[in-house]
A protein has these predicted regions:
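N-terminal alpha-helical interaction blocks
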Residues: 1-15
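Residues immediately within or flanking Cys/His clusters that coordinate Zn2+
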Residues: 24, 43
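Short cysteine-rich clusters marking metal-coordination/redox-active sites
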Residues: 27-30, 46-49
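Cys/His-rich microdomains that often coordinate metals
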Residues: 33-34, 52-53
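Long, charge-rich boundary regions
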Residues: 55-132
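Cleft-lining beta-strand/loop regions that shape enzyme active-site pockets
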Residues: 106-188, 195
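Conserved catalytic cores of soluble enzyme domains
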Residues: 162-281
Length: 281
């Protein structure tokens, strides 16, 4: 029998302290908790494992273009609930919810600006808005951006991230695949460059249209890129899928992606490509 007994230490009663929202982020790559400020300063790349997290469209544009040169276009376009879609929440309610959380009216920010001295038309998709699905507004804004680049005879840059076509708009969303692709075909006929940047994830209707039509296709490291998901493909083909299937690295090895570029080096790489295109025109 013990002579001395160590008293049990009990935690002080009270409510569990909660970490204020938006102060820290848990990295999907390594599981480490990273301060939000540190992530923002590092272009949303995890400083622990180099995982490329989703980057808001405005932040992406600021990291690519020369300071104070971006001019936004078609900022007032917004989607309409033409199908009067009903579900757990109406389409109108969902649009309102994502507008409040992101400050955007839809899933893409478009405009024109200067990148290292080169005039460009640019469209950047924001996965934070309804998984950056492509509806009538997204397709229209991207098409207008391409047409602006064609008219102004400058390069077009599209940074894609998407879960595909927007089911809330039915056939109207699928029509955007043909519309954006047609605009790019006319842009190409004018011998003008189009650079496509694929980020995590880029899938379905977006990948099956404008995202895969770049003169140069760049992907961020370890991005998921494909049409249907691995589970759907496996169930359809009844075959085991290759290791690293639908990753940027796998697609680069098989010639579907031209290069993989770290986010911090993306501006310099695009500038190099633009200088090449300018020299060959």
């Amino acid at each position: 029998m013990a002579i001395f007994k160590k008293p049990a230490i009990k935690a002080a009663a009270g409510k569990k302290r909660e970490i204020p929202r938006g102060v820290f982020q848990k990295c999907p790559g390594c599981g480490q908790v990273v301060p939000e400020m540190e992530l923002g300063q590092n272009q949303r790349v995890c400083p622990r494992c180099d995982y490329h997290q989703g980057q808001p469209a405005i932040e992406r544009i600021q990291s690519l273009l020369d300071p104070d040169t971006f001019v936004e276009m078609d900022a007032d376009l917004r989607s309409v609930d033409v199908l009067r879609f009903q579900g757990m929440a109406t389409y109108t309610d969902r649009l309102k919810k994502y507008h409040e959380s992101t400050g955007l009216l839809d899933a893409v920010v478009t405009g024109h600006g200067i990148l290292d001295g080169y005039k460009v038309a640019i469209a950047v998709m924001d996965f934070g808005f309804l998984a950056a699905t492509m509806g009538s507004v997204v397709g229209e804004k991207i098409t207008r951006t391409i047409e602006y680049g064609t008219t102004q005879r400058c390069a077009v840059i599209i940074v894609a991230a998407s879960g595909g076509a927007r089911l809330y708009e039915g056939m109207l969303s699928l029509m955007q695949m043909a519309k954006t692709s047609g605009a790019l075909a006319r842009h190409g006929e004018e011998k003008l460059p189009y650079i496509s940047v694929l980020t995590n994830p880029t899938t379905a209707g977006v990948m099956a249209s404008f995202a895969s039509l770049g003169d140069v296709i760049i992907a961020e490291p370890k991005s998921m890129i494909g049409f249907a998901g691995p589970r759907v493909i496996k169930e359809t083909t009844h075959q085991d899928l290759p290791e690293r299937f639908q990753t940027a690295e796998f697609l680069e090895e098989h010639g579907l992606v031209d290069m993989i570029v770290h986010r911090k080096k993306l501006r310099d790489e695009i500038s190099r490509l633009l200088s090449y295109f300018a020299a060959t025109r």
